[in-house]
């Protein structure tokens, strides 16, 4: 009887242990992973989260959008496990994290180009210089630069209607720093939204509209919008896989990031998600319209991740 009982106990333990493995040998995990932040990085992270759900169906991964700045506010309070960012964390945001004992790891995940776009009926703007963009968007332009022919005399004597990301957006921060010369400095009389789809719809419906957002959103809506080449002194350049990666599309090419909460990283489901993220992002980033980092850079990011997690005690 004892031997039979021992057999059943051993068999039960074997089945129990075996059931913690997926068919592909991956350990089954549970729990929730909360992600928020940049609308620009959202398509990459959501695509990866969808793939991860297929591998780990018992892990609930939610990806919200509150802009890079809004995402860092939540992240610094420990409300999210991962935050998407279309710019590097600011000193003030890092200080907020420190004040709340939130440690973090910064990981570069892809490159992005900012697209300058107009309505398809706009037959006069095929390119624009960096100086002209500054003339349009700098704070001094508010109430002064109102018409297209104030940018170039041959352009129409018609009001220019501007669309752009809101002030909590990392895209807004990056654009203003690259074009105006100081992050966050801009005229205020433009249609602003953290939702890039609102900007797309606004420009699509306005012959005299002009705006900017991540190039992936242009790619999704290229049948509704017209892309404008940006001239930094070397001729008009369009944002493409090649020009963003090789740096010729400057100053509007930038790196994209995720930030991982150190305490969250101790949880096996978060650790596995970030590991999975770094494995699949080279392919998925390109599939959703972004530019992958060079292969050696992904190796470096993975090494950063491995070093970071090796110093964190495992969660129990």
Predicted feature locations:
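Flexible loop/hinge segments at secondary-structure junctions
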Residues: 17-316
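Sec-dependent signal peptide recognition
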Residues: 1-8
